[in-house]
Swiss-Prot record:
Main location: plastid
Subcellular location: Plastid, Chloroplast
Keyword Chloroplast applies: yes
Organism of this sequence: Chlorella vulgaris
GO cellular component: chloroplast
Protein name: Uncharacterized 20.1 kDa protein in psaB-ycf62 intergenic region
Keywords, comma-separated and alphabetical: Chloroplast, Plastid
Length: 177
């Protein structure tokens, strides 16, 4: 699974995920609604990739996620309150699922042109039928969606993005060690 993910990522983004490759090297930020995802690779990271063997980490890593909710008329106020008051420290590793497509990390905000993650947020965050609902539902989402965040070292910036086909904004997430 790790090899499949690495190959798919390299084919799509041109960089192999790995701490030695992506240290402060890639920034994902939202564009205007519907325009998708912007990527700014750092040239030093590309050179670093050529000079080092980038290895995935196999051990569990404590990944701290601070969540910035940008909701319009939230349907799940308990979950929003939980996110505001409880930054999540989640032990993660590579064996956890990445998202709706196995080559698509769930924290990539693709916009509806790319069709990557909008439905993931809509269904997981707001599906009150899920066991545990609210808080537990979001914990499960973050434990899966952030399963590879330790590879990126500050690569993900807070996002305030509202796709045209959604009635509320998705969550902006800042990830770091």
């Amino acid at each position: 699974m790790v090899t499949e993910f690495r190959d798919a990522w390299e084919a799509r983004y041109g960089l192999v995920p790995g701490a030695c490759c992506l240290k402060n090297s890639v920034t994902f930020s939202s564009l205007e609604s519907g325009q998708g995802l912007e990527r700014n690779p750092n040239q030093e990271a590309l050179a670093d990739r050529k000079n080092k063997k980038c290895q995935f980490k196999n051990e569990y890593v404590a990944c701290h996620a601070t969540v910035f909710p940008h909701f319009v008329n939230p349907e799940n106020p308990k979950a929003v309150e939980f996110l505001k008051n409880h930054p999540l420290n989640i032990p993660v590793n590579m064996d956890m699922t990445f998202g709706p497509l196995k080559d698509t990390p769930a924290f990539c905000y693709g916009g509806h042109k790319l069709g990557l993650c909008n439905s993931l947020y809509d269904s997981i965050i707001y599906d009150d039928t899920y066991q545990g609902k609210g808080e537990h539902n979001l914990k499960k989402f973050f434990s899966e969606a952030i399963a590879t965040c330790f590879l990126y070292q500050n690569a993900i910036k807070p996002i305030n993005y509202k796709p045209k086909n959604m009635k509320h904004s998705v969550i902006g997430v800042s990830l770091y060690y």
